[in-house]
Amino acid sequence: MADDDPYGTGQMFHLNTALTHSIFNAELYSPEIPLSTDGPYLQILEQPKQRGFRFRYVCEGPSHGGLPGASSEKNKKSYPQVKICNYVGPAKVIVQLVTNGKNIHLHAHSLVGKHCEDGVCTVTAGPKDMVVGFANLGILHVTKKKVFETLEARMTEACIRGYNPGLLVHSDLAYLQAEGGGDRQLTDREKEIIRQAAVQQTKEMDLSVVRLMFTAFLPDSTGSFTRRLEPVVSDAIYDSKAPNASNLKIVRMDRTAGCVTGGEEIYLLCDKVQKDDIQIRFYEEEENGGVWEGFGDFSPTDVHRQFAIVFKTPKYKDVNITKPASVFVQLRRKSDLETSEPKPFLYYPEIKDKEEVQRKRQKLMPNFSDSFGGGSGAGAGGGGMFGSGGGGGSTGSPGPGYGYSNYGFPPYGGITFHPGVTKSNAGVTHGTINTKFKNGPKDCAKSDDEESLTLPEKETEGEGPSLPMACTKTEPIALASTMEDKEQDMGFQDNLFLEKALQLARRHANALFDYAVTGDVKMLLAVQRHLTAVQDENGDSVLHLAIIHLHAQLVRDLLEVTSGLISDDIINMRNDLYQTPLHLAVITKQEDVVEDLLRVGADLSLLDRWGNSVLHLAAKEGHDRILSILLKSRKAAPLIDHPNGEGLNAIHIAVMSNSLPCLLLLVAAGAEVNAQEQKSGRTALHLAVEYDNISLAGCLLLEGDAHVDSTTYDGTTPLHIAAGRGSTRLAALLKAAGADPLVENFEPLYDLDDSWEKAGEDEGVVPGTTPLDMAANWQVFDILNGKPYEPVFTSDDILPQGDMKQLTEDTRLQLCKLLEIPDPDKNWATLAQKLGLGILNNAFRLSPAPSKTLMDNYEVSGGTIKELMEALQQMGYTEAIEVIQAAFRTPATTASSPVTTAQVHCLPLSSSSTRQHIDELRDSDSVCDSGVETSFRKLSFTESLTGDSPLLSLNKMPHGYGQEGPIEGKI
């Protein structure tokens, strides 16, 4: 807006086209390149320093040192200089402050210092030295309240003295030239032009930047300085305390690496920036000379007090990299593309298996034949002492996840059985028993005999052996002093150990026979159920592994054989990632296993290493059916609003995962819709707006009765975010739901300088920022001011048309009458759920004829008669189906037989490509399957509710808060 010429054709005053030179082109005044002319001209020898100089207020006194030159250094000061070329003699040089826009105008700030008066510096040059320096120039900052007053006086003075009025005030005043007396009287017309120009330029003036305009006047024949040379304009000078004038600098980031998929939150501290004029740029210079760049995602509400930015990383150009990629990150100002010094940033490959489920599945599976190769290791399938599969005796190389060397189990492969010992009278031969722990720790190797004493002396039928705990020994038991005692003791313990081994072998043999008879694997598991508490190198128990490898029946068998004994210990056992079996069942999407675990008492309240409960995990993955199972548990209620380690509730994660079904389940289960996440106080509605998800935002407002003006810790409402991001759809939705565009957050609207308070100017409390102040475009600004939302349609946006128009008005009336019955299984609300429009049920209830409103919505969204028939069939509503069938019966059909459902399905319907397009639109972000976007695009509530009622009220604020916001026919 500031770059447009406010005085062009069509304005109050017409441009004087007789002017032959382009007085409005700032590029005309090349600062340092000499003009191609034979006569006198003015040239800038040294530019002023652009940054680092502070504009001072009246109360602060003069500047400490004048405006330095561009080449000024600490020990070598320099100042702006100009030279009058091709001329020697007396001259007068004036310096005026002008704006930095495309069109040059007078600036309201004033030059102060030696030779300065009324904001203008006047210096004489010559007659010999035609170089003029300005060693003590200062810039006086005018307050906002006095901009118009000061600017009008400055313009009047320029017109009276003839100091470039046609250029700096208005083109219609170009005829006013410098006069010797300087006491010209202005006409009323000239004063009006000045006033209008001052009004317009006051609105557009940037108080943080100025330029110096140098104009030289040579004497005429009378000695008066009236011969004006073409002025020259310096580079821009930025106020050092203005946000857009400071040097950009990254001070600190809490992370310097992120995943290639982007979307990770980073906190960045920086020097002063302007929240609506800053970008965070990621870039990489490629080998072929190209440059990849991406920009951090944040809105003005994510910039805190001009010194901190919270943003999300962009996606890297290649998300399939196999090794880290180094890029750079820097701040960049939008207005002038000024950048900060780049900092390194590392993109690492995507970790697709964060829960390590796939890694564990990829382990080498145990091979059955490995158990018969060496003869020294324990056999598979129960052939060894503890029936460890996976090739797994302690003397062999245990298979991953199956050999538990840390327990130091001794091998018993040398034992054979004779008839008379087992049920089958198979004999036993006492072979050599090696009782040394070859795979155990050093301390355990010496204590194998002592450990055998820990076995129970007598086991009852059906109980397994106690687990050896050799590794807990810290010191070997003192042995007898004589060799004879030691040999006797060793012999006794060998005999005792052999006896226990035989008892254990007998039990396993019995279990094997029972399995052969019944075919029930639980017969084998029962004798080893005490070992289900053993964990592998990852901390996983057999129950963890069975779930990871999707063996649902094995999980059920394990739960059955351990029921009532050690069930609680293994059901809620955590692995090294703090995952319980229930966590893994949710992660691997096994609904039946989740139900089995809950039935035997799995604890929902246990959290994983990130503080996630099973509700968080189900919502994150969008498993609505599993989430439904979990929410049915009585123990789920206290966890619904429990935050995880990131401070997020399950409802927040459902929104961030774009899962409408999970969100609906949580709302129905009583989740606190207005709960704040613990980092910045955002509610689920804030997050839906932040993710530009109109579907979820509509669900929260319509189904969850979300507080539309809920605030974060810094007072930001969802409307602030929508306005700052320029989202017209969400701004319209929130405004229609009653959002207040005048709510102020805690971010100051402007930076109040301390000196203003000292000067008594602009005193008082600095106002906060409202959504109106943050409107990123005119469309949002108009919506916030009450203008109806009018979306711009493209060919891709046009909704596909269904065939509902084939139903006659009489048929529609009969259907609506049938759908108004109170039976919950056959009324309009149930049909709406079947048709995917259930989220609008609350809105439908506000209508005098909900069933008619439903049918109108369904037609607008491209619904077909086929889908309507299928929905009615699912409801079992034969009367409604017959009404539709009757509408398509021909006389011949009526005389012969009624039309079948299959025949109705053969009626003219929309093409398959059209239906596919409908499904794509419903699944996309732009058109939600909830029907909210459909309502925004096509639905006129004026037509669908009563036919003439203009408003549908959607009051989604707490009772007694604010005012109701109506949704009009067009938003």
From Swiss-Prot:
Residues 433-971 are annotated as: Interaction with CFLAR. Residues 40-365 form the RHD domain. Keywords: Acetylation, Activator, ANK repeat, Apoptosis, Cytoplasm, DNA-binding, Hydroxylation, Isopeptide bond, Lipoprotein, Nucleus, Phosphoprotein, Repeat, S-nitrosylation, Transcription, Transcription regulation, Ubl conjugation. GO terms for cellular component: chromatin; cytoplasm; cytosol; I-kappaB/NF-kappaB complex; mitochondrion; NF-kappaB p50/p65 complex; nucleoplasm; nucleus. Residues 801-888 form the Death domain. InterPro entries: Ankyrin_rpt (IPR002110), Ankyrin_rpt-contain_sf (IPR036770), DEATH-like_dom_sf (IPR011029), Death_dom (IPR000488), Ig-like_fold (IPR013783), Ig_E-set (IPR014756), IPT_dom (IPR002909), IPT_NFkappaB (IPR033926). One of its GO terms (molecular function) is RNA polymerase II transcription regulatory region sequence-specific DNA binding. Residues 646-680 are annotated as: Essential for interaction with HIF1AN. The modification Phosphothreonine is found at T946. A lipid is attached at C59 (S-(15-deoxy-Delta12,14-prostaglandin J2-9-yl)cysteine). A motif (Nuclear localization signal) lies at residues 358-363. NF-kappa-B is a pleiotropic transcription factor present in almost all cell types and is the endpoint of a series of signal transduction events that are initiated by a vast array of stimuli related to many biological processes such as inflammation, immunity, differentiation, cell growth, tumorigenesis and apoptosis. NF-kappa-B is a homo- or heterodimeric complex formed by the Rel-like domain-containing proteins RELA/p65, RELB, NFKB1/p105, NFKB1/p50, REL and NFKB2/p52 and the heterodimeric p65-p50 complex appears to be most abundant one. The C-terminus of p105 might be involved in cytoplasmic retention, inhibition of DNA-binding, and transcription activation. Glycine-rich region (GRR) is a critical element in the generation of p50 (Nuclear factor NF-kappa-B p50 subunit) by acting as a proteasomal 'stop signal', which leads to limited proteasomal degradation of the C-terminus, while generating p50. Component of the NF-kappa-B p65-p50 complex. Homodimer; component of the NF-kappa-B p50-p50 complex. Component of the NF-kappa-B p105-p50 complex. Component of the NF-kappa-B p50-c-Rel complex. Component of a complex consisting of the NF-kappa-B p50-p50 homodimer and BCL3. Also interacts with MAP3K8. NF-kappa-B p50 subunit interacts with NCOA3 coactivator, which may coactivate NF-kappa-B dependent expression via its histone acetyltransferase activity. Interacts with TSC22D3; this interaction prevents nuclear translocation and DNA-binding. Interacts with SPAG9 and UNC5CL. This is Nuclear factor NF-kappa-B p105 subunit.
